[in-house]
């Protein structure tokens, strides 16, 4: 899939149920491209470790690069960022460059399966409810956006800073 295939605006983003790793990956690619095209000011992504997200793909980091303008903010919530470092080096490089707009938080409470796998934006959301089958829902509905944002805000309140952009040594 290339940038031409991706949605030009958030109204073209899928709504309803999704299922399977391919559909899940495409959903993330489309969402980041829509964020770049529409200038979404805030994005929150949450997952236990982001291992199966396509964060390191050229299309995603390119869309994030296009999205990275004044006044933007990406918040990441995860239990562990080891998989991001190991599987998504292109994203790690992007994150280091844009560390001033990327906040990474660690969630240490409860088992990892209780941490939602989701993306929240002011315009659109998705949540993966079945991690094994990569199945969940996406949409623009205000009630879903509000409910997901409230749940993620609760996680943020209990989180700690994590995944520093640089590691300073002695």
Segment roles from a protein language model:
Residues 1-44, 48-170:
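PLD/PLD-like phosphodiesterase catalytic module centered on the HKD motif
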């Amino acid at each position: 899939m290339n940038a031409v295939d991706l949605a030009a605006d958030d109204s073209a983003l899928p709504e309803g149920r999704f299922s399977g790793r391919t559909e899940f990956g495409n959903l993330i690619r489309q969402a980041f491209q829509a964020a770049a095209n529409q200038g979404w000011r805030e994005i929150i992504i949450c997952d236990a470790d982001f291992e199966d997200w396509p964060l390191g793909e050229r299309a995603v980091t390119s869309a994030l690069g296009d999205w990275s303008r004044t006044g933007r903010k990406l918040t990441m919530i995860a239990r562990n960022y080891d998989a991001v470092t190991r599987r998504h080096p292109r994203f790690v490089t992007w994150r280091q460059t844009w560390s001033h707009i990327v906040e990474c938080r660690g969630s240490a409470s409860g088992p990892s399966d209780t941490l939602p796998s989701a993306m929240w934006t002011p315009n659109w959301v998705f949540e993966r409810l079945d991690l094994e089958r990569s199945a969940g829902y996406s949409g623009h509905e205000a009630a879903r956006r509000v409910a997901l944002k409230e749940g993620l805000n609760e996680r943020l309140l209990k989180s700690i800073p994590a995944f520093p952009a640089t590691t300073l040594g002695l």
